Structure formats: structure tokens, C-alpha cells
Amino acid sequence: LVLGAVAGGWMLNGALKLWIGRPRPSTAAVTEVFGSSFPSGHAMGGTALWVALALVCLAGCRSVPARRAVLAAAVVLVVLTALSRPVLGVHYFSDVLAGVAGGLAWTLWLARIWPPEQKLG
């Protein structure tokens, strides 16, 4: 699930960047970044990774405090990854929102269709 979420999210992100082709913010010229701005690949990939890892951990976890800790960690890591992009000046806020939404949608869809015999828990 984790590999499928990250690899599929990366491919989906690349296709969307080619299709939309939005240029990066002008402040991105200060740093070495390549490619289109929309959607944020870091936000999409980070969301896919952290949500997939959380789903795998939650599948094997029955303790309510541990489940809350896993969810909190995933949320914090997604938010920190997402916020780093506009702070560094390499993405617009809308790029990041689209990246998080895309990563979340892709991973939840993948988790839903994943073969039942390969699911954890």
C-alpha cells in the first residue's frame, strides 16, 4: 500500500504538472527548482506517504491512545511538509492545497481498492 501510494502519487503528480504547466512563483528563481508549480509534488508525495503509513499502522493497532498518536503524527507531518513549500517560496498556497488533496484522495482510493487478502489487520 505504501509503495503503491507513493509511486502512484508521483506519477499522478507528474501527469498533472505536464497537463497544467503552471509556472512557479517568481521567488523560486532564487532556489534551484525545476518543473511546473501545480500541484506541489512534495505536498502530494508527503501526504501519500504519511497517510499510507498511518493506515498500515492503524490496521495493526487496537490501542485508542496509540491510534490517536499515529493520526496526530500523520497530520503534523503532512502539515509541516505542506507548509514548507510556500515558506521556501517554491509553491503557491493553492499548489500545496491541491497536492495535499490529491495525495489524500489517491491514497484513500488505493486503500479502498487494495486486494482484501493483502490488507493488514
Briefly describe each language-model feature range.
Residues 29-121:
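Membrane-embedded catalytic cores of phosphoryl/pyrophosphoryl-handling enzymes
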Residues 17-33:
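Membrane-interfacial helix-loop-helix modules of multi-pass inner-membrane proteins that assemble, modify
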Residues 7, 20-23, 61, 80:
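Short, well-ordered alpha-helical segments in soluble proteins
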Residues 1-10:
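Interfacial segments of alpha-helical transmembrane regions
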Residues 12-21, 83-85:
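C-terminal TM-helix exit segments that contain a strictly Trp-centered aromatic cap at the helix terminus
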Residues 10-11, 48:
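Generic recognition of short, well-ordered alpha-helical interface segments
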